[in-house]
């Protein structure tokens, strides 16, 4: 006969599919009390309520989230600095678009995680600190958390949504406005700064929003790469290896909350600055 207590202590022996849970309510009730499978809500709540407490000797939850945010923002900033200018140029200059669109289009379908083997071969566990040749100091140890391989995965994930939206935003600008401004003597700089960028801004901002969301989703995978010893993604991975499911769930909730807050910030900017776009369609 099937021993409930024995199975509860050996959760790997069965598969907890929705169908199994519905067809075995008695066994499910026993397993709910197993903190390795489903930790009590109060344990998860305690971790979230005290983000400054040390967690399984891996630093605080808030500290790891902060490190992850810095990594995401660094990789994301690099994607913005390349994606927006290149996208605007490709949208405005048809020749450049024809030249680069096919080339970039070959890389767009590649998932960010597919780059991992190449990234590790290229960069190994090098960080910004080692790449800059900094001496051992407080700045060195801070920048040593920013592994180039992690930043690249985040960068490549955010780049294409930003680039595509910038191209689309410029291509949909009314060309009559551009031609009229050129006839009236406007310089290329004036056309870019006073016509193209303001008109394309809603599409660009939407691309920035999508890109940040993708960058945040790439975070956990990036922090699983060799060389990572901090960050909420690494915290989740380490917590799993030591059987701390409560920390895993708390980390997942933290990622969800921070990602939602970042998305809400961009939505607020879109509503605040570009509400007119809704009525111009």
Can you say where each PLM-predicted feature lies in the sequence?
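Transmembrane-helix boundary motif in ABC transporter permease subunits
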Residues: 74-104
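Periplasmic/extracellular loop-to-transmembrane helix junction in inner-membrane transport proteins
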Residues: 4-77
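Membrane-helix interface segments
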Residues: 92-100, 145-148, 188, 244
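Alpha-helical membrane-interface segments at transmembrane helix boundaries
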Residues: 62-70, 74, 97, 104-107, ...
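Generic hydrophobic transmembrane alpha-helix motif, especially the helices
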Residues: 105-161, 168-169, 224
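Short cytoplasmic-facing helical segments at TM-TM junctions of multi-pass membrane proteins
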Residues: 165-204
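Transmembrane alpha-helices
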Residues: 188-221, 250, 254, 266
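C-terminal transmembrane helix and the adjacent membrane-cytosol boundary/short C-terminal tail
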Residues: 171, 249-281
């Amino acid at each position: 006969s099937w021993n409930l207590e024995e199975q509860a202590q050996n959760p790997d022996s069965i598969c907890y599919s929705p169908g199994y849970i519905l067809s075995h309510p008695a066994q499910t009730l026993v397993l709910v009390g197993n903190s390795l499978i489903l930790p009590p809500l109060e344990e998860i709540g305690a971790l979230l309520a005290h983000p400054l407490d040390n967690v399984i000797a891996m630093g605080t939850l808030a500290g790891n989230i902060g490190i992850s945010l810095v990594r995401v923002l660094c990789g994301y900033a690099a994607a913005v600095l390349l994606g927006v200018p290149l996208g605007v140029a490709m949208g405005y200059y048809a020749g450049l678009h024809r030249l680069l669109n096919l080339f970039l289009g070959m890389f767009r379908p590649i998932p960010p995680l597919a780059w991992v083997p190449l990234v590790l071969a290229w960069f190994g566990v090098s960080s910004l600190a080692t790449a800059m040749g900094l001496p051992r100091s407080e700045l060195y140890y801070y920048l040593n958390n920013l592994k180039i391989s992690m930043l690249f995965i985040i960068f490549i994930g955010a780049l294409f949504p930003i680039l595509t939206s910038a191209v689309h935003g410029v291509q949909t600008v009314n060309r009559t406005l551009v031609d009229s401004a050129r006839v009236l003597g406007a310089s290329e700089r004036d056309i870019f700064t006073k016509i193209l960028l303001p008109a394309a801004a809603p599409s660009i901002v939407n691309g920035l929003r999508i890109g940040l969301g993708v960058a945040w989703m790439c975070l956990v995978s990036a922090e699983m790469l060799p060389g990572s010893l901090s960050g909420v993604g690494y915290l989740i991975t380490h917590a799993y290896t030591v059987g701390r499911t409560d920390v895993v769930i708390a980390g997942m909730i933290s990622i969800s909350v921070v990602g939602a807050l970042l998305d809400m910030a961009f939505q607020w900017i879109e509503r605040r600055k570009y509400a007119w776009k809704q009525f111009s369609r």
